[in-house]
Amino acid sequence: AQVADVDPARTVRENILDGVRPVLELIGRFERLPPHSPEAAALEARIAALDGWTIDTRLNELVTSLSAPSLSLPAANLSGGELRRVALCRTLIGQPDMVLLDEPTNHLDTEAISWLETYISRGRGTFVCVTHDRAFLDAISDRVLELSHGGLYSFEGGYVEYLRGKADREATAEQQELRRQRFIRREIDWIRRGP
C-alpha cells in the first residue's frame, strides 16, 4: 500500500526519529550513566557501531534532501505527499539492511529523486523498489525482477538490460511454441494417415 504510516499526533521530527528509536534509547541510557561507569565504554562502542552519534546529521540531510516539511510541524497538518516524504525519511534514517520501496519517486521533486538515486546507488543495504518510473529504475538497478504469467524472471542490470533480456526470452518462447505446434501438426497428420 502507498499509505504513509505516520502518527498524526506527533511532530515530523518525532515520526522520523521513530526509525532510530532503539538507538536513541541507548544514547539516553549512556547519558544517564555516572561518569567513568564500567558500562559506559561498551555502550559508547555499541552506539558508535550503530552510527548513533550521526543521527542529527542524518536527520538534517534527509529532511533537506527529500524536501520533507519542517521538523516542528504536527503530522496531522501534512498533505499526503508530505506524509510519504516523512515516512521515507523515517525508513532511511535507520539505515536498514533491506528496504522495500513502493513507488518511492511519487511526490518527490527532481532534486529529491536525484538525491535518492545517489543514496540507493551508494550501496548500503539492499533496496527492493516497485516503480513505474523507468528512468529511476534504470539509474538505481543492478537487477530487475519481473513477475509474469506465474513465473519470476531475473535480469542482470537496469531497465534497458531488462528490456533486452525480456525480448530475448519472449523470442525464445515464441520459437519453442512454433516448434511445439509443428510437432503437434506432424503427429496429427501421422494419426490421420493411420499406422
Region locations from a protein language model:
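ABC ATP-binding cassette signature C-motif
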Residues: 1-178, 191
